[in-house]
């Protein structure tokens, strides 16, 4: 019966989209070629949905051998479907670059959901664990984000349960320039922390709290590829990906170190712009401070030539050192070492002048001490002719009174005086000398 109905109609052309229909589907009296174009499109949609929900039956089993039916080898049968995604959007090997990242013009052209970048390491059931992003996922980096900011909280406070991920976490923006990569990483780290992955992210002071799982590594790779397009990655990031295109954690660690370095660079340049020196501190300390700043900037890829460095230094000089701003204006090739040589010379002259002033300046108390010392050292000592000590039982006044009495009332031949030739005579004079009577 079925063969008679097929023989009554004209043969099916090789280009028909319904060439793979089964014998049960052609039991209608209407010629399948007379179906309108709208019904044909509807048939194709139904057919596509049917193939996506149930395994496709091989053409050899679907179409029985019939001499009046079109040959299945010559008919253009639709390509078999590979999962729920159309074949024409699958990533081909030609779409991958040397670093392993597929080349997409825009994330909306992503052939897989955000967490199925490649079938080779898409874990089973990964789609049910992570958030599926809506169509506004393609925002740019300059779009304001509530999670964006220059600082992010400590990753130790984040949870690690991926099944409880916030369903309303805003995704990071799309990277549009290599110069904005570090700013993009700040927002991306904030996004990971809001997705309960903060404890797998290392910081500048410590390593990650725990090691990530395979599902979390897949999540990291997928989101990084989705929002950081390969053509906008810096060179050093591409170098890391060329070795291992899944080593996203190394990229994040190096980015954090670069952020810290950039902060130090800003501080160093600010310090150079606000230098101040007036000789209150040693010249060696000032030179060491400036030299360390210049060396740090040079090591971080920001070399400062001698002309600019000398301008920074001279602008900070004040007081007597302000003269150095104009002392070497004729020298075009002046170096930082030459300028510091002048600063050292002026500092030594300043210190020598201070020492000389302190030497010539004398206080009144020091002058009194010097005068007293001079008087004591020039006072003559008393001289005695006899080794016998004088009698000190009487006072000096009494002895002088006795001598004067004996002079006023002398005895015959001055017996009193002659009788005491061995005793010294006390004379009241300004030198307080003790003389013998014979020498008076």
UniProtKB/Swiss-Prot annotation:
Basic and acidic residues composition bias: residue spans: 363-372, 429-440
Alphabetical keyword list: Cytoplasm, RNA-binding, Transposable element
Record region (RNA-binding): 299-401
Record text about domains: The C-terminal RNA-binding region of CA is sufficient for all its nucleocapsid-like chaperone activities.
Region annotation (Disordered) ranges: 1-75, 137-174, 350-440
Site (Cleavage): 401-402
Biased composition (Polar residues): 1-31, 137-168, 373-409
Gene Ontology MF annotations: RNA binding
Protein name as it appears in the record: Transposon Ty1-DR2 Gag polyprotein
GO CC term (a single one): cytoplasm
Note: Retrotransposons are mobile genetic entities that are able to replicate via an RNA intermediate and a reverse transcription step. In contrast to retroviruses, retrotransposons are non-infectious, lack an envelope and remain intracellular. Ty1 retrotransposons belong to the copia elements (pseudoviridae).
InterPro entries with a match to the protein in the record: TYA
Role: Capsid protein (CA) is the structural component of the virus-like particle (VLP), forming the shell that encapsulates the retrotransposons dimeric RNA genome. The particles are assembled from trimer-clustered units and there are holes in the capsid shells that allow for the diffusion of macromolecules. CA also has nucleocapsid-like chaperone activity, promoting primer tRNA(i)-Met annealing to the multipartite primer-binding site (PBS), dimerization of Ty1 RNA and initiation of reverse transcription.
Assembly with partners or alone: Homotrimer.
Subcellular location: Cytoplasm
